[in-house]
Each structure stands twice: as C-alpha cells, then as structure tokens.
C-alpha cells in the first residue's frame, strides 16, 4: 500500500482520475488500506472500484482475514463431515460462476463463466470474492484434517499420493496451468469448465501430491526453501508498478 501511494500519481496518464484526487480522500484511502479496510466505491480514487486503490490485489488478503476469522470462530470447531458438506456447497458456488448458472440472479448482464472478480464492494463482486475464498479454504482445511488422521510411521504425511520428485512435477503442472489461463476464448462454457476443473480437482490434487512428496536432495530442498521465504514478502508488491504501464 505504501509503495502504491508513493507511485500513485505517476499513473496519471493511464488513470486520469488520480490527478483529481483531493488530499483528504487520498489520506483516508491510505489509512483504510494500511488497516486492511475495504474502501467503498464512493472512495475510489483510481477508477477501478477496488478495495484499495493503491494496491488492488489487497482484496485477496482482506478475504483471507475473513477466512481466518471464520476459522477461529466456526470452522475449526466443525467435524470432518460438516466440513465436507460445506465444501460441497461452496463447490456449487464455484460452478455457479464458472458454468454461468447464476442461480441467484446476481449478474443481470449475463453469465460469468469465470471467477475473475472480488475486488469491489458490490453484490456481484462480494459474491465472487466469497466464492473464490470458501471452496479453496474449506477444501484445504478438509485435506489437512483427513491427512492428519491418516498419518502413520510408514506414511508420515498421511497423503495417498506419493511422487518421486513431487516438487518438480507439481511445479511443472502449475507452470502449464498458469501458461494457459483460458481456453476457447476469454469467456464461454469451455473456459468455465476448464477453470472449474482446475479449482475443484487439479489444485487439491497438487496439494495432496505435494504433501505426500519429500525432497531428499539438497538442490530441491534449497529451491523450496528459497521460494517459500520469497513468496509472501513479495506478494502483490509488484502491482503498484503495473499501474504505471
């Protein structure tokens, strides 16, 4: 957020609204951004209607905080069967978006066929944000519970999937998926199905494969350690610079 504030006015060419921002609104948005409080559209100072006009992807961290609060008060107390039921319900929300069902009539302009969104304080964007949060969060929690109950001396991870060189195989699958962000055009049923399969099936399988694989050589271990230490400190720090492109 501070990096975004420092470079905020340098993006005036792409976002003319930034040059007309009064000091009081700039300051208020900065304080709210630092406190991880989402700004309403009336405080949008860039023109994209984001939670945080200085660093748009911060919306994902806001939803992560909501997930942590739900975990602290509700999810951690639930048995595995209840988590499984909730996970199935939230999988439906994901399919509602990716397959364009719009069961609740939230999208008057037509089907989504995608999970893109979640960064504005509108009914549609909040629905997308919670749909993106809940299934992965609950699925990860359910996997953790199941694996912990399966651990043994011969299978310390509890995972049913064990791959030799699992780190490299999982990394390769992720690179392939990220290299193909959509198929059949940017919108449509084919792309929605592709996104649903990745979210609901492929990513959980990658988690299972990763948790069941052990790095035994120094090279893989050092790469894992380096990426792990680098990933969170650098998360979304690049985005303020992208605004200026």
Residue locations for each model-derived region?
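Alpha-helical transmembrane segments in multi-pass integral membrane proteins
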Residues: 39-48, 74-78, 118-245
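Hydrophobic transmembrane alpha-helices of multi-pass, membrane-embedded glycosylation machinery
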Residues: 6, 90-92, 142-143
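Catalytic glutamate of the conserved HExxH
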Residues: 65, 69-72, 239
């Amino acid at each position: 957020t501070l990096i975004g504030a420092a470079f905020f006015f340098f993006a005036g060419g792409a976002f003319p609204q930034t040059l007309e921002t009064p000091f009081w609104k700039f300051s208020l948005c900065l304080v709210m951004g630092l406190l991880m409080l989402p700004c309403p559209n009336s405080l949008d100072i860039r023109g994209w209607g984001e939670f945080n006009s200085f660093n748009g992807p911060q919306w994902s961290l806001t939803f992560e905080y909501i997930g942590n609060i739900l975990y602290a008060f509700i999810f951690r107390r639930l048995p595995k069967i209840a988590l499984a039921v909730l996970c199935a319900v939230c999988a439906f929300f994901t399919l509602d978006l990716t397959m364009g069902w719009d069961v609740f009539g939230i999208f008057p302009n037509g089907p989504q066929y995608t999970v893109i969104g979640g960064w504005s304080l509108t009914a549609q964007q909040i629905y997308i944000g919670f749909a993106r949060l809940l299934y992965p969060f609950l699925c990860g929690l359910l996997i953790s519970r199941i694996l912990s109950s399966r651990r043994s001396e011969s299978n310390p991870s509890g995972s049913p999937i064990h791959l030799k060189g699992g780190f490299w195989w999982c990394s390769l699958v992720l690179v392939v998926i990220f290299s193909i962000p959509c198929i059949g055009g940017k919108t449509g049923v084919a792309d929605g199905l592709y996104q649903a399969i990745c979210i609901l099936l492929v990513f959980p399988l990658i988690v299972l494969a990763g948790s069941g694989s052990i790095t035994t050589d120094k090279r893989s271990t050092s790469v894992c350690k380096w990426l792990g230490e680098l990933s969170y400190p650098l998360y979304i720090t690049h985005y303020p610079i992208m605004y200026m492109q």
